[in-house]
């Protein structure tokens, strides 16, 4: 349990007065929670620590009893053995949070709850639901007078217990009724809760989806830095751990850098050798990174780094194919001693590459959310989102403070790279970034995330790209038309018109239309 100041203790005491009432017929639960896996149990304990009376329910009721007899014993936590009993113990408006497997189980529990709920009651889905499902539930429940909230919850089991990052969205009428609970139990960054209202319908789960996509990108970038140190620098795991420990004291200070340090320091107790080197090099995924990449394609936003992070996991899963290909496909390899003569410069370059690529990853993530806000009619608070991610979640980092500051100063900022801080940072990091990608290519080390981040940056800063030729090709084989470059108009190539040319004739035939291909 966290330490609280005197005012907080008085608040907790007042909240607990109803719990001390022995009359069981009085509805005294502040919030109900369905799903007693570790995340659910820890979030209940967190709420109880903050003075809230929580009613716990699980499909397997024996789990409720075990929880009450052990972790929840002596705390302001009540149990329920049925949905009706859960609802009956809650104050109005009833606030019920689901922490169950995404998909059909969420709909099943909602359907079980509905017969016992009244207009104005609140259902909160705190699982990893896909945002289109949250959009649907928001609409369906609104017709029944039930306020639906889809909330991203990040931070894992530890975060749920000590303070997660919470990203609620849905029916805004619910926010005044859940705001105090959510912001009390959420992680704090510089005294501010890592929780705020995100937006309508499925916006909360959308923001959590993008969070998870960025998480994929951050992890892949870290793995590529590790791979370069291991295979090109020939560093021992302890040395690499030392590098990450140093990086965690600077601009890269973050949860993922911190745990990477810990992993690299950990030795198998049976033989004293680094445990990480004994792990099969095939990475799993639950699909949220893929959701982000697919949505980026749907909205036409080049979220290339997250896409490559997803594909890298797919390639890692092709272990048998890679083993076979490693024997047949030729290319540069580093054998014997490391070709790196200046280790400090090599490490400094990698730090710059990691920092610059991280900036690109977040730039792309916020570009995607900006477009989603336009397409889906949401009002997203980018500064608030960055603040939510500063603590309690997997991608929490010092770096996010600068994003929060940028969007507070310029709420309508379209691209983080155009904000002075990030423009300056990526300019300074560019030399080491390019050197690291160059070494990876030279020595045959795959760095898809570093490389695509750099390609995106160079593409974005290019006033002219070769898409003119691409559009001509499309017009050649499919009559998809094109527009003429400003200043190149003539009697055949008319301004602001879509033009088709018969490319096979000498000089060609020209036609124009206002059709946008």
From Swiss-Prot:
NADP(+) binds at residues 35-40, 58-60, 100-102, 128. This is 6-phosphogluconate dehydrogenase, decarboxylating. One of its GO terms (biological process) is pentose-phosphate shunt, oxidative branch. Substrate binds at residues 128, 154-156, 211-212, 216, 286, 313, 474, 480. GO terms for molecular function: NADP binding; phosphogluconate dehydrogenase (decarboxylating) activity. The gene is DOR14. InterPro entries: 6-PGluconate_DH-like_C_sf, 6PGD_dom2, 6PGDH_C, 6PGDH_Gnd/GntZ, 6PGDH_NADP-bd, 6PGdom_BS, NAD(P)-bd_dom_sf, Pgluconate_DH. It comes from Candida albicans (Yeast). The lineage of its organism: Eukaryota, Fungi, Dikarya, Ascomycota, Saccharomycotina. Its EC number is 1.1.1.44.
